[in-house]
Amino acid sequence: MKRVVFHVEAEAELISAAARYETHRSGLGLEFILEVERATRALVSYPKIGHRFSRRLRRVLVRRFPYGLLYRIDADAIRIVAVAHVRRRPGYWRHR
């Protein structure tokens, strides 16, 4: 079973998005984090669950929120390269 590793910038995106949601409603940031955790657990069980997003990346959507986890499957781990809003700044993560 592969482990999930977040790129340092993807982890920062997760924290930033959760903080924004928390300003909208108390507890919503935690709900966002829990949905991201649910998606990462699904990736561990089914690494190819996300649709092919580019030549080397896949994307799985986060339930209830307009975010996707962009990831690649390496020999030793599933690497989350971005926690990206589905409608904002497309492709900003490509250098990762």
Spans of features found by a protein language model:
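Generic structural signal for secondary-structure transition and capping sites
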Residues: 19, 26, 41, 45-48, ...
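Basic/aromatic recognition patch in beta-strand/loop cores that engages polyanionic ligands
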Residues: 45-78
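Arg/Lys-rich, positively charged N-terminal/basic patches that mediate binding to nucleic acids
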Residues: 1-33
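Enriched for short, Lys/Arg-rich terminal
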Residues: 30, 68, 72-96
